Regions:
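Short, conserved turn/kink motifs that form compact alpha/beta structural patches or helix kinks used as
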Residues: 31-81
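Short intrinsically disordered coil segments
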Residues: 22, 106-107
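Broad hydrophobic/π-residue packing in well-ordered secondary structure
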Residues: 2, 6-10, 52, 89, ...
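Extended boundary segments
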Residues: 1-46
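Short, compact, well-ordered microdomains
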Residues: 68-106
């Protein structure tokens, strides 16, 4: 399946949950603290987690020349778009958390 993606990173590294795991950040997240730093298309993967792992490697090892953010890290958010809509994922310490439901109604 092909996915498009949007990477969000915290604007101000002094934000109290910057680079913190999901358990600490989940009640603090404010999407106004984030900037969309990169949009891409046509990442192929068998499932969302496989795509997120590919993106993590790409944006740490061999990021695109037009990428203006920092290496992908804990507290980054990636939105994956497919034919069924979109889902939001939080880069946690050791895995990815689907936070789509957690963000409903938040700004």
């Amino acid at each position: 399946m092909n996915y498009a993606y949007l990477i969000y990173q915290i604007k101000d590294m002094n934000t109290d949950y910057a680079f913190m795991g999901w358990n600490f950040a989940k009640d603090r997240i404010n999407l106004m603290d984030y900037d969309g730093v990169y949009y891409g298309r046509s990442i192929d993967g068998e499932n969302p987690i496989a795509v997120l792992e590919k993106l993590f490697e790409r944006f740490n090892v061999n990021h695109p020349d037009d990428f203006k953010g920092h290496s992908m890290s804990v507290s980054d958010i990636v939105v994956l778009f497919d034919d069924n809509g979109c889902k939001w994922y939080y880069c946690d310490r050791f895995d990815w958390k689907d936070i789509t439901a957690d963000l409903r109604g938040r700004r």
